[in-house]
Amino acid sequence: MSMPFYVSPEQLMKDRADYARKGIARGRSVVVAAYDGGIAFATENPSRALHKISEIYDRIAFAAVGKYNEFENLRVAGVRYADLRGYSYDRSDVDARGLANAYAQTLGTVFTTESKPLEVEIVVAQVGATAHDDQIYRLSYDGSVADEHGFVVMGGEAEQLGTAMTERWRPGLTLSEVLRLVREVLAGPPVDGSPREIPATHLEVAVLDRTRPRRAFRRVAGPVLDDLLASPAGTSGPTGEPGPAGTAATDGGDL
């Protein structure tokens, strides 16, 4: 009679964690950073259809790395959670902390009970009336939650890019300064002595603008993004508002 195969709980959890980390490492990094007028999100993403940065509720946004179908399901669940809570109670009762707790329960349950963990890492951010009131939560594949301040980097090169952000980011940067910094950080170190530059068309950028009265989320693209990346510090407004001729920046929500 053969003995049943046994795997210790410690080894099982380690294998699941390694599996999830490998899946996350294959994704391009996402940087979330505070600026003087709110919170900016940026990632290298040539796709126009598949977003890694999205609006959840009035002043709450979501960013993720990993398997698209898995974090897209989480995004949709987050939108439904926020809508239901806002409808049942009050819109002011919907906050990033509650959403992060809901995500943590889902991620933790899947990690411990399902056959495979979710290969995702997500950030839930909420812009407040002042920079002191901003909330940024980072959630890992196992449901662990970290309360971040200033900026956070996710993805395969998170440690290396996080070091670069630590050295160069500081409170009070304008949106233009933050986006130019993030693009340089995402490009990584020079290759063969030549720095790599990410085209603006390959960047997915959005902001939570604290000056907007209700829906703070705004995508930044087209001429507005070009101006922010090229202009000297402080010449473009922190909101990314369209100019008189119109721009490709979209107003709130996904397409």
Curated annotation (Swiss-Prot):
Pathway: Protein degradation; proteasomal Pup-dependent pathway. One of its GO terms (biological process) is modification-dependent protein catabolic process. The formation of the proteasomal ATPase ARC-20S proteasome complex, likely via the docking of the C-termini of ARC into the intersubunit pockets in the alpha-rings, may trigger opening of the gate for substrate entry. Interconversion between the open-gate and close-gate conformations leads to a dynamic regulation of the 20S proteasome proteolysis activity. GO terms for molecular function: threonine-type endopeptidase activity. Pfam families: Proteasome. PROSITE patterns: PROTEASOME_ALPHA_2. Residues 232-255 have a biased composition (Low complexity). Disulfide bonds: none annotated. It comes from the Bacteria. NCBIfam families: 20S_bact_alpha. Belongs to the peptidase T1A family. Component of the proteasome core, a large protease complex with broad specificity involved in protein degradation. The 20S proteasome core is composed of 14 alpha and 14 beta subunits that assemble into four stacked heptameric rings, resulting in a barrel-shaped structure. The two inner rings, each composed of seven catalytic beta subunits, are sandwiched by two outer rings, each composed of seven alpha subunits. The catalytic chamber with the active sites is on the inside of the barrel. Has a gated structure, the ends of the cylinder being occluded by the N-termini of the alpha-subunits. Is capped by the proteasome-associated ATPase, ARC. This is Proteasome subunit alpha.
